[in-house]
Amino acid sequence: MLFFPLARRGRNENESPLRGGLRAVTLAASVSLGALSGAAVLTVAPAPVAAQQVSALMQSIAEAAAESKDLTAFYRANGYTPVFADDSARARARRQALLRAVQLAPEKGLAPYDTTLLTADLRAIRSERDLGRAEVAMAKLFLDYARDVQTGQLVPSRIDSGIVRQVPYRDGVSVLTNFARSNPQAYLRALEPSSPEYARLLREKARLEEVLAQGGWGQEVPGSKYEAGQSGNGVVILRNRLMAMGYLPRSASTSYDADMSRAVQLFQIRHGLAPDGVAGPGTLSQINVPPEERLASILVAIERERWMNFDRGQRHIWVNLTDFTAKIMDNDRVTFETRSVIGATQPDRRSPEFSDEMEFMVINPTWNVPRSITVKEYLPMMQRNPNAAGHLRIVDRNGRTVPRSAINFAAYTPSTFPFAMKEPPSDGNALGLVKFMFPNKYNIYLHDTPSKSLFGHETRAYSHGCIRLQQPFDFAYTLLARQTSDPEGFFRARLNTGRETVVELEQHVPVHLVYRTAITLPKGGMEYRRDIYGRDEKIWQALQQKGVQLRAVGG
């Protein structure tokens, strides 16, 4: 498949002892890069026999690497030859590049690394055995940094059960082998995500850190509602905050004028609110969010970018759950966008986060009612009234229709009910008139819906987990345009038959269900969305436990 790695493994495997619980101490100021990377590292008296030197060094490296399968395999393959701790120019370049990258880790949204033990090892080198221990300590630090900056500091599934994303963890042996063969600075840079979103998030992180250093965005806005024509102290405070946030040009005006209405509208658009230009309770609550909270959202988004550090597809479908939209992207450009309805906020209805490939669409689909909905919702209804949900067929294990009169619903429990339920194709079908399939074990897909009124809501979390589309026909036309000259005619000819019809996509399209509360704009600026499932709050708490910090950094 286009974007899934062949090798994956748990993130906590082979954790380095260099990273203690705090991991908050950066390189000691008294230890310069030059001191750590220069010839002083190698003040080892030569032994009489070269073979004895090699033997002691090999033994030391083997012992120090024994707790890590990756390091053991790497050093066995290279004959236990140091790649960091010798006096060659290449080894010095590797040390310098790694230590510099580690020093700058907080600028990348990573927790600072505690290199106290490594510093002590480097200073204490007096023998070949010391050299071997220092070599492996550097290699462990490299692998820790490489995994953190490349695929994230957290294991997503351990944060929230709805984050079922497969992170593309790289094989440690290959990463270390390729590093040893490459320009070290270039290789370390290449570990980071290459997406434009990641680069823009880092820039916004730096900007917000400077905002914090300058004292923030000023006083919170009091009151509950402001609108055009008003003036007074509250309006002045609101104007000042909008100016500090960059939504309103500097001026001496003290009234809620047309410029201020436009600024509020722009703010509302950027925060997923109805753009009426009135600063009501919902808008004011977002205006009063402090920059610290926005910076935390940026740091979470950076971590999420690392979880998706793979090729997302030249054409792909991007469903941002918090934004209630579904987009078709071509070369990082939105070529189609529609509103969506996502899973409700109840824990068992929330839409999961994962990536897959769309393979086909079904026109005039039958709704095979999920087992959970059948026994939790419809069975109790039919126990009260056997004729309830009469639009649904009841079928046995062989797919044969069973008349309701033949079923004693009261005799069954959710675990013993032996039947399934289906809804035939129709305008009122729960899936509407088309569904888009990327087969997965979560039974999640995109589809039409007869409940069109929900798309007019600001917050659209109502489904059982699947993604409903406001404009499913146009979505289908955009997908089909690559395999037929008349996509609308092709689609409607099959729709008009009323029969269930499967249409294969000649080229499968990657689908990414994501959850981003901080979203950069290609031409500059940010958009923010509410953390409707509470997932980002969990991620931020976990990042803080790892040692990630909010920083105030002057320009």
Description of each model-found segment:
Residues A24-T43:
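Bacterial N-terminal signal peptides
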Residues M1-G20:
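N-terminal secretory signal peptides that target proteins for export/translocation
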Residues L2-F3, A51-D70, F74-R76, V136, ...:
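Well-ordered beta-sheet/strand-loop patches within structured domains
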Residues Q52-Y169:
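Cationic-aromatic interfacial patches
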Residues A39-L42, P46-Q53:
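Boundary at the C-terminal end of the N-terminal hydrophobic targeting segment
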Residues R8, G20-L22, A51, A56:
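N-terminal, cleavable Sec-dependent signal peptides of secreted/periplasmic/extracellular proteins
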